[in-house]
Amino acid sequence: MGNYSTAIDKKWQDKWAESGLYKFDPNKEGEKLYVLEMFSYPSGSQLHAGHWFNYGPVDSWARFKRMQGYNVFQPMGFDAFGLPAENFAIKTGIHPQDSTIKNIAKMEEQLKAMGAMFNWENEVVTCSPEYYKWTQWLFLKLYEKGLAYRKKAPVNWCPSCQTVLANEQVVDGACERCSTEVTKKDLTQWFFKITDYADELLDKLDGLDWPEKTVSMQKHWIGRSTGSQVNFKVKDSDLNFDVFTTRVDTLCGVSYVVLAPENPLVDEIVSAEQKEAVENYKEEAKKQSDIERQSISREKTGVFTGAYAIHPLTGKEVPIWVGDYVLATYGTGAVMAVPAHDERDFAFAEKFNLPINRVIEAKDGSETNLPFCEHGILVNSGEFDGLTTDEAKEKIVEKLSSMGLGEKKVNFRLRDWLVSRQRYWGAPIPVVYCEECGIVPVPESQLPVELPYDVEFAPDGKSPLAKSEAFVNTTCPHCGKPAKRETDTLDTFVCSSWYYLRYPDNKNTEAPFNPELINKMLPVDKYVGGPEHACMHLLYARFITKALRDMGYLNFDEPFTSLTHQGLILGPDGLKMSKSKGNTISPDDYIKEYGADVFRMYLMFGFAYTEGGAWSDDGIKSVNRFVERIERIIDTAREAISKGENNKTTMDKAEKELNYWRHNTIKSVTDDTDKLQFNTAIARMMEFINALSKYTQEKEMNLDFLKDVVSDYLRLLAPFAPHFSEEQWNLLGNSYSIFNEAWPKFDPKALVKDEVEIAIQVNGKIKNKIMVSSDLDEEGIKAAALADEKIIASTEGKTVVKVIVIKGRLVNIVVK
C-alpha cells in the first residue's frame, strides 16, 4: 500500500487555503480564463457522483490552464431556491431556509474535500437577500424596457404541487415531480418577452463553440418559419380568424380547418348540437402537455364544432374542427388542413372521413401517392394551375393581399418566458397593486423585497405569501395609499439566468455588478454542465445577456463562448442512479477509502468525459493500484537521486529513450487535456511511468536528467491528482507549489530517435525486429535486414524475389 490518503488531501487543502494559492486577482499577469461549472441545487442527498463528474475533471482542466499561464477564475455557488425545499417543508415542517442553509454547509464541505481550486471568496447563493435583491433589480429593468409584462394565460397546473409547470415538466400528462395528472388553468401571470430576441437568439447560435446537438435543439425550440398568414371568415357571422402556413401554395386543397381547444373563438362558433361534445373534448385536452399533443406518433383526435369557414379564394364552405394537436400558444391557434399534402392532416381526414383534394403534382408529371408533401406543380387550383410551388406562393399571397385576406409572415415556435410561480421559496416579484395607481414597481431603494420567515406551507393553491398579511399589506410607493404586494415568486431559472455576471463582483452592495469589471471578465470562456438545460437555462441566460447589453450594462453578445456537456455516470447495473433502485454511489465512502485524487482520476480515466458510463468498483481499484505504482517508482527515483551513486552526465541510449517518452507524453497529454479527452491523457501517463520504471533499473543513471524527468511527470500528473502530486513535489525537495510551476513544453527534437525499431517479415510473417539508425537510407535498411542471423536462417535455401522497405516501420522479404 502507498502512503497517499485523505490525510495528505487535508494537509494540502489547508496549505492552499492558508497561502491563498487560488485567490483570483483580475490585475494579475496572464490571459483571463473564466471557467464555470453549472452551479448545483443544494439538495438533501448532497454531492453525488454526477456532481463530481461535472466539477472534478473541469477543475483538472482549469489547473492545467493555470499552469499554462492563464489567469484562471473558477467560482462556485448554489442555485438555492426551488420546489424541493418547499415540498420538504410541507412534509417535515423544516423551514426551506433552514434545510437549504444546512445542505449548503454540507455540500461546501464536500466540494472542499474534492480539492478543487474554486474561488470561494466569490461564492453566490441565490436565496440570500444580497443576491436576490439584484434578481429583483433585473426584473425591474426588464419591466422598464417593456420586456416584463402581465397577462392571463392557460398554464399547466399540478393540483398536488399546487403550482404552474413548464411544458418540459409535464411527462405523459403528469407532473414529473409527483406524477399527478396535470390540468390546464387560466391564471394571470408575469412573462418575460424573450420573443423580442428570437431572431438574434437564432442567428448568433452558429458563432458559438457549442455541441452541435444543443445548437440544433435551440434552433428547433426557437423554430423560425417563413410563410404566410391567411384570413378565413366564419359563415353567417362577422367573426374571422387567421392561420399561419408555410405552404400557401396548397390553399386550394384546404378541406377543413382546425382550432386549438383553448382558442376563444371555439366558444363563439360552436353549434348547440355540438356544444356538449366540444366541452368534453376541451376538458380532455387540459390533461395533455403541449409536447404530448404535438407528438407525431400519437393518434390524432378532434371534434366538429358545427360551424363553417368561408374559403378565401374559392368561397366554398369549409368545416371547422377542434383538435388538440393545434396549440393556442403557437402561431394563431388555428391551422388550415390540406390532407392531400400533409401527413398529419391526411391521417385526421381519413379517420373522420373528410375530403382529400389533390392540388400539387410531381414536377415530372409522374403518378404519386397521397399524401404528396414535396414541392411540385399546381393542379385543381384555378388560375394558379401550372405554376411551381415557389411561383404559386408569390402569386397567391399577392392575390390574398389585394383582397385584404393575407400577407407574408415570419412565425416562431418560441413563446414568451412565463416567470410567475405560486410558491414561497423563490425571489418575490417586486411589484405592488394599488387601487389608485394600478401596477406599481417597487423602487430600487426599497429592494430587496424580502421573504417573510413565518409562513404557512399548506398546499391549497394559494401562494404561502398570499396568506401572510404582514407581507401582503403595504403602501403604494407612488401615492402612499394602502396597496397589496404581488404574492407570486420568480421562476428559479430567473436566478440562474444572470449568476455568472455576479460571481466576479459578488461583494458589490451598490449594483449587481460593475460593468467595467464584468466587461473585462466576461464572457465565460468555458461553461460545463448537463445537456438537459439546452432549451431553458442556456436560452434564458442568452436572452438576459442580450437584454442587459441593449440597456448599456454589457458590451458582449453571448454569455458562454465555449460549452461542454459532461456525460452521465450510471449505477454499476448500467441504469441511471436512483435511491429507489439502490444503485447510487456515495463519493464520500470511496474518498475515505482511496482519497480524493483516486476518485477523481477514476472518473477521468474510466469514462470518456462527454459520454460517461457505468460505475465499476474494479475500475477504481485499478486506478488506486496505478497511483500506488507511481509512488513506488518515484520513491525509487528519489532515493537514487538522494544517494547520488552510479551517476553519469551523458545522454546515452537509455536516456534518449526515456526522453522520447517524456516529450511524446508532454505532447499527447497537452493535446488531449486541452480537448477534455482526459481518459486518453491518463493512458499516456501510464505509458510514461512504464518507461520511467524501466530507466530506474539501469545500473548507471544521469541523475540530473532523472530529476528533470520526474519533475515533468509530476507537473503532468498535477491537474489529475493535485494532492498526491503536491506531496511528491515537496518530497522531491522542490519549492511550493507545483501549481505555480509552468506546464512542461514539448521538444520536437526529442521525438527524432537516433535509432528506430524495424520489423522484418518474410512472406508477410514477422521473423525478427532490429534497431537501425533513423537516418539510414533504403539500401542500408535492406542490407541490415538481409544480414540479420534470424533472417538468414528463415531464407536459407530460398530465392529472394524482392525486398519491400517501409522506412521507419518494416521490411518485407518475398522469397520462393
From Swiss-Prot:
Belongs to the class-I aminoacyl-tRNA synthetase family. GO terms for cellular component: cytosol. InterPro entries: aa-tRNA-synth_Ia (IPR002300), Leu-tRNA-ligase (IPR002302), Leu_tRNA-synth_edit (IPR025709), M/V/L/I-tRNA-synth_anticd-bd (IPR013155), Methionyl/Leucyl_tRNA_Synth (IPR015413), Rossmann-like_a/b/a_fold (IPR014729), tRNAsynth_Ia_anticodon-bd (IPR009080), Val/Leu/Ile-tRNA-synth_edit (IPR009008). Coiled coil: none annotated. It is found in: Cytoplasm. The keyword Aminoacyl-tRNA synthetase applies. A motif ('KMSKS' region) lies at residues 576-580. ATP binds at K579. A motif ('HIGH' region) lies at residues 40-51. It catalyses: tRNA(Leu) + L-leucine + ATP = L-leucyl-tRNA(Leu) + AMP + diphosphate. HAMAP family: Leu_tRNA_synth_B. GO terms for biological process: leucyl-tRNA aminoacylation. This is Leucine--tRNA ligase. It comes from the Bacteria. Keywords: Aminoacyl-tRNA synthetase, ATP-binding, Cytoplasm, Ligase, Nucleotide-binding, Protein biosynthesis. It is an enzyme of class 6 (ligase). Its EC number is 6.1.1.4. The gene is leuS. One of its GO terms (molecular function) is leucine-tRNA ligase activity.
